[in-house]
Structure formats: structure tokens, C-alpha cells
């Protein structure tokens, strides 16, 4: 009704020497001369759904400034012990607070749920902190994350509860009753704290409230929900037209903007 025509199984190949758009089609290469072009080609994640970032070198060859595509809304890598990885991978860390610092040193905290994977952490809570965590990785080779495993208890409350006689209870049972920690949270404490820290009520309570997790990498770009990087803001005017290519506009995940989600969820 609006005059829009959809051409499926067409891949944009850039421009020919006369500025016409080139397309690879089932019937061979097609050229199209236009006055205005809107590029909305996605980022670089989930290439099998079409957004493979192959447009980046095409624009760079025309003088458009591009920041390299990196994972965003993604999982992060931490090499766990075989016991934790084999026993608890895939289990949720529910009702926790995750904290880190921005590149400028600002404290950032979010409450929610994360998933312990066989080689790290993922889930909506981790995705929400993916930008500052990735920036730390790029700057120093590792990222520092702190988990509060019992956000509804103060450290003093936990210390007092854990200082009481166990009366034959195991530590796991005591932590479940007094701090509300399930098996995966208890296992994570044993993974990240020393035996001496676990045995002392003061350091154990501190660890429950601020468990340090060092992350060593991101999951691959192709697994990320979205990608950071893309066409730099300085390469665009206020209408999102490319300064180097008048009449050509860019939109969506192609832009260098840290979006809260990406085309993968729209497609899925």
C-alpha cells in the first residue's frame, strides 16, 4: 500500500565505479542507480541471521570512519574448576547484585539474575554490565566484577548469624538457613574464597556481600545479542547521513552506539 517492494535473497556488494549500488541476486549481479540510500544492515553478531558486519570494509573504502565491532550484551569468560563447571554449569544465580566500575571509575550496580556457564557468566544481569566490563578488558586485559549473593542481608547480620554455634549443621545447610544461599552460590563461595576465609565468620560474611570475580574475556562476537562499534558519530550529520557519501544514511546497529538490545532478539 505504501509502495514498498521487498527483494529477498539480495546481498548488497557496495558500489560500482559509477556509484550505482551492486547487488548479488539469484539472477546474477544487479546494478541500481538511486539518489538516496538508507543502510540498515545490522551489527556483527549472529552472522547466520544476516548481520555479519561485511558492510564495514565497504564503507571504510569510501572514507567512512568505523570503530571495530565488538561483543555487547554478551557473556564473559572465567575459567572455573572442573567441579564447579561440571556440577553447576547452567544454574541460575538468583536475586544477586553485580557491581563493577566504568572506565571513568564510577561505581555501577545492577540487581537481577545471572547464569553460571561452563566457562564464565552470562544472563541479563551480566549483559547490563557488558559495556564497562568490556572496556576494562580492552584497557587492562581483565575485568573486575563483584557479586552480592545475599542483597537482603547486611554484612553485620550475616556475620552475627554465621558466628553462632552450628549445632551439628554443615556449612552449606547453615548458609542456606541463615543467608538464603542455594547450592550454586555456596559452591561459588568455595570457588572464589580460601579455606581460611570460609572458616572465619567475618571474612565469609564479607565474601558473601562482595565476592570478587575476575573475568578474562568476552564470549565471541557471533554469540553476542548485539555488537558495539560501527559507524562513528563524527562520520554522520544530524540526519544520520554519511558525510563522505551524501545521500547515503545509516540506521540501527550499524551505528557506534551501545544499544540495550539488538536485531537478534527482533529476529528470534
Task: Describe the function of each predicted region.
Residues 1, 7, 46-51, 78-82, ...:
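Short beta-strand to alpha-helix junction loop
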Residues 42-62, 242, 257-268:
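A conserved FAD-binding loop/helix module that cradles the flavin
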Residues 22, 36-40, 46, 97-248:
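Residue-level recognition of phosphate/Mg2+-coordinating polar/acidic sites
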Residues 12, 24-31:
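A structured beta-alpha segment of the ubiquitous adenosine-cofactor-binding alpha/beta core
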Residues 6-10, 68-70, 219:
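Short loop/edge segments at beta-strand edges and connector loops
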Residues 55-98:
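Central beta-strand plus flanking loop segment that forms part of the substrate or channel wall
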Residues 253:
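Hard-cation-handling environments
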Amino acid at each position: 500500500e505504501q509502495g514498498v517492494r521487498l527483494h529477498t535473497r539480495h546481498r548488497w556488494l557496495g558500489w560500482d565505479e559509477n556509484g550505482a549500488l551492486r547487488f548479488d541476486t539469484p539472477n546474477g549481479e544487479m546494478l541500481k542507480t538511486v539518489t538516496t540510500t538508507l543502510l540498515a544492515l545490522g551489527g556483527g553478531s549472529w552472522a547466520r541471521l544476516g548481520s555479519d558486519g561485511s558492510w564495514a570494509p565497504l564503507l571504510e573504502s569510501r572514507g567512512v570512519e568505523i570503530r571495530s565491532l565488538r561483543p555487547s550484551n554478551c557473556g564473559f569468560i572465567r575459567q572455573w574448576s572442573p567441579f564447579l563447571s561440571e556440577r553447576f554449569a547452567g544454574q541460575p544465580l538468583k536475586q544477586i547484585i553485580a557491581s563493577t566500575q566504568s572506565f571513568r571509575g564510577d561505581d555501577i550496580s545492577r540487581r537481577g539474575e545471572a547464569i553460571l556457564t561452563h566457562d564464565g557468566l552470562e544472563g541479563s544481569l551480566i549483559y547490563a554490565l557488558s559495556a564497562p566490563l568490556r572496556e576494562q578488558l580492552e584497557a587492562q586485559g581483565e575485568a573486575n566484577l563483584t557479586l552480592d549473593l545475599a542483597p537482603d542481608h547486611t554484612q553485620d547480620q550475616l556475620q552475627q548469624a554465621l558466628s553462632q554455634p552450628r549445632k551439628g549443621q554443615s556449612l552449606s545447610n547453615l548458609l542456606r538457613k541463615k543467608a538464603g544461599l542455594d547450592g550454586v552460590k555456596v559452591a561459588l563461595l568455595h570457588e572464589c574464597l580460601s579455606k581460611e576465609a570460609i572458616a572465619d565468620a567475618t571474612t565469609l560474611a564479607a565474601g558473601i556481600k562482595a565476592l570478587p570475580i575476575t573475568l578474562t574475556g568476552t564470549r565471541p562476537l557471533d554469540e553476542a545479542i548485539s555488537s558495539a562499534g560501527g559507524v562513528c558519530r563524527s562520520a554522520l550529520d544530524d540526519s544520520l547521513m554519511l558525510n563522505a557519501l551524501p545521500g547515503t544514511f545509516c540506521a540501527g546497529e550499524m551505528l557506534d552506539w551501545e544499544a540495550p538490545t539488538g536485531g537478534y532478539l527482533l529476529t528470534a
